[in-house]
């Protein structure tokens, strides 16, 4: 018997990828799988984005809690079959005992951190790096309507200008050498623009534009359509990389740091990733970028495997089929542990090489 009524812990509802993923899973749990989704959220938190709360309210029953410990009682009172939570992945007190807990881990974790009734990672890369594919994974989904409008006129950006852009968590564009290279590049080329959404400002220039965060999907698509390419500069990299997927599915190339420790986005993009190791390579990419040639290429690496239907099929198989992927059934061999150690060593060597390119 599968779980049918699922409680999703939204915690703090923000503009970050975790809240986007939480919404997508809950929505398609209803629309594709035909189940019921109930959203729990932390009423005490001051970090909620009102636009994100409104987005959730349009589709789900929202139930507030004062303290995480209240969820045992609330889950029982609402006859929840299972409790889903997406979090960093280590053992903590964010688990409830009254119903099965479905743990979705966002970051690399040691094997000793496995807990809950079902435990899965958010990407194939995490499953490989941390368990040699023995811990299951359920990826995020990328789903965007096909709209043609952009923000160039609104932002006074000429049609012929080269535009590079990024959105994400406010602190996610954090490679200092990239920030400096952007400022150097706009000084070298009067036809180059950079636009950022929900990113903390790091420069003052009329062609480096910072926009506030926006949860509206139409606006997000207009933002992507404004860009000729994504410039990605999150030092740690991506354990999944929703924003990279959203640019890619809109047929925009992703320019990303080659030496990041977390590399799911690089694995998925494969040969279509435009990678840089240091400021010289990045400046060359900016200055030599051919927007017309780029627009004629196929950059989409996400439509086939990461659309809602295949993702929710995997979500159902891993999380909802009542024990078919139970955490206590995960068996890790000595060979698996050795493989995970090898991946960690490779990560350290990559990190040590960073200074060679600065």
Regions found by a protein language model. Give the residues of each.
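Short alpha-helical segment that forms part of, or immediately flanks, the ligand-binding pocket
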Residues: 221, 244-249, 263-264
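Short hydrophobic beta-strand element within catalytic cores of glycosyltransferases
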Residues: 253-258
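N-terminal strand-loop element at the rim of the active site
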Residues: 9-16, 23-70, 200
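A charged, aromatic-enriched C-terminal amphipathic alpha-helix characteristic of glycosyltransferases
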Residues: 17, 290-344
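Donor nucleotide-sugar binding/catalytic pocket of nucleotide-sugar-dependent glycosyltransferases
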Residues: 116-148
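Acidic donor-binding loop of glycosyltransferase active sites
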Residues: 79-82, 222-239, 252
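Conserved active-site histidine-acidic residue motif and adjacent donor-binding/catalytic loop
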Residues: 65-72, 200, 208-224, 260
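Conserved catalytic-core segment of nucleotide-activated headgroup transferases in glycan assembly
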Residues: 140-204, 210-213, 217
